[in-house]
A protein has these predicted regions:
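N-terminal hydrophobic membrane-entry segments
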Residues: 1-177
Length: 177
């Protein structure tokens, strides 16, 4: 503690510069000055979305990113772009001929436009779940039990068409039902 150490001072206008330079980030990590920055690593299967003061400002590519948080609120949302299974569990439904049946369906969905997905709905998966529920109800209620048993593939196609027509605004797609 008694040795003389050289200190370099570099002024950075954080009001004008949002992104933290890599050479500064390494030094800040080493000194644990993390309160002034928000950093994250966006994986290869993810899309990162940068929100500054609640406004979407940029889509982040895979890699390490850091931003000055002095004088502003920084939030980074990471959205998984891989197909995700979505299971609509045991719904009790009545067929056209008033027979009670229990329907379970698994769909695979994928986010194709992360900006739309982040801005369109608070929870895209919950919205997709409800859309699939409505589609199943519509397809089953219009048929008798015998028609349902004979036309399972047709019902899958109807459910997929119903959901596909409504999820474009959510930035998602159904890859398989």
């Amino acid at each position: 503690w008694k040795t003389v150490t050289a200190v370099d001072v570099e002024m950075i206008d954080t009001a004008q510069t949002l992104r933290v330079d890599k050479r500064h980030l390494d030094k800040l990590d080493a000194t644990r000055a993390g309160g002034a920055i928000v950093s994250t690593v966006v994986d290869a299967h993810e899309a990162g979305l940068l929100f500054v003061d609640g406004v979407l400002t940029e889509r982040l590519a895979p890699g390490r990113h850091a931003f000055w948080s002095v004088g502003r609120t920084i939030r980074i949302a990471k959205i998984d772009m891989r197909p995700q299974p979505l299971e609509v569990t045991a719904q009790e439904l009545l067929t056209k001929d008033r027979v009670g049946i229990r329907v379970t369906l698994t769909a695979f969905t994928r986010i194709v436009d992360p900006e739309k997905a982040a801005l369109a709905a608070g929870d895209v998966n919950a919205t997709l779940y409800r859309l699939i529920q409505f589609a199943i109800r519509e397809a089953v209620a219009a048929r008798t039990l015998d028609e349902i048993l004979a036309a399972r593939h047709t019902i899958d196609a109807e459910v997929r068409a119903y959901v596909t027509n409504r999820i474009g605004s959510l930035g998602a797609e159904v890859t398989e039902i």
